[in-house]
């Protein structure tokens, strides 16, 4: 059974790629067509690869794998934090700090510092310090929480990393490759499939597309750990509306209606 329908993918705008002039030729097998200078992703391929990614992630979660979600672009940051938290995973949704994985020992000292200041705050010690010192520590705490809050409970390197926007997160990709940590990623038409162990051809710029794909991967982790999905959890967006249409014609019509491509799609 497919974890997502073609109408759901279409409604979320998963099919909108980048300008054809910016494509990576390695993505040719996953491109359906070009219209008005924009590449259109083959949603049949997306559904197939999402099914494979779902099973890969679910089976990993069953084995006790710990996952790290990475997505620092504005459109992805909130989704990454929400979905990672929902399925009990770690996340980086601000700036990727150099050496976050390859220099884990040093990053761990900064996490320890974050926890130290948090303890000072919860114990009331900060309130008893001189105002200037307390203000300095609160600023330090805010900065550490911003960049490391999503991984402060991570005791060791993750077993797999889920990445939104391979090109933007190039440093994270290279660190994973160096450490042989499996990469699961959304691949837009300007990406390189050779840099991912598991990938899903998808628009990686539109909020609804990111929400749909990342949400399904979070579902897979949750299902792998708990044996079933929690039906109380509902997506923020409604992707379930049934549409009676010829998908091929509709995809092309959507693109022809766009003068500059999907308004949510980056250049």
Swiss-Prot record:
Source species, domain of life: Bacteria
Endpoints of the signal sequence: none
One GO molecular-function entry: structural constituent of ribosome
Coiled coil region boundaries: none
Biological process, per Gene Ontology: translation
UniProt KW keywords: Ribonucleoprotein, Ribosomal protein
InterPro entries assigned to the protein according to its UniProt record, in alphabetical order: Ribosomal_uS2, Ribosomal_uS2_bac/mit/plastid, Ribosomal_uS2_CS, Ribosomal_uS2_flav_dom_sf
Any Pfam family hit: Ribosomal_S2
Cellular component GO terms, alphabetical: cytosolic small ribosomal subunit
Keyword Transmembrane helix: no
Spans annotated as Disordered: 247-267
Family matches, as HAMAP family: Ribosomal_uS2_B
Family: Belongs to the universal ribosomal protein uS2 family.
NCBIfam families referenced in this protein's UniProt entry, alphabetically: rpsB_bact
Annotated protein name in UniProt: Small ribosomal subunit protein uS2
Gene designation per UniProt: rpsB
């Amino acid at each position: 059974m497919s974890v997502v329908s073609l109408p759901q993918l279409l409604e979320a705008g998963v099919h909108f790629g980048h300008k054809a002039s910016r494509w990576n030729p390695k993505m040719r097998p996953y491109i359906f067509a070009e219209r008005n200078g924009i590449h259109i992703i083959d949603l049949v391929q997306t559904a197939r690869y999402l099914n494979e990614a779902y099973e890969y992630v679910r089976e990993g979660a069953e084995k006790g794998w710990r996952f790290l979600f990475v997505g620092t672009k504005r459109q992805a940051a909130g989704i990454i934090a929400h979905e990672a938290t929902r399925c009990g995973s770690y996340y980086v949704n601000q700036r990727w700090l150099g050496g976050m994985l390859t220099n884990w020992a040093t990053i761990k000292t900064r996490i320890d510092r974050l926890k130290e200041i948090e303890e000072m705050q919860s114990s009331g010690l900060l309130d008893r310090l001189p105002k200037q010192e307390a203000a300095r520590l609160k600023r330090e705490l805010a900065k550490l929480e911003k960049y490391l809050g999503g991984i402060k409970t991570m005791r060791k390197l993750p077993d797999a990393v889920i990445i939104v926007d391979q090109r933007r997160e190039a440093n994270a990709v290279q660190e994973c490759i160096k450490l042989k940590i499996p990469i699961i990623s959304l691949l837009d038409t300007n990406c390189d499939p050779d840099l991912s162990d598991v990938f899903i051809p998808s628009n990686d710029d539109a909020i609804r597309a990111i929400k749909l794909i990342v949400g399904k991967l979070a579902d897979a982790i949750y299902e792998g750990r708990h044996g079933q999905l929690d039906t109380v959890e509902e997506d923020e967006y409604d992707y379930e509306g049934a549409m009676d249409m010829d998908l091929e014609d509709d995809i092309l019509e959507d693109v022809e209606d766009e003068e500059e491509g999907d308004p949510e799609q980056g250049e």
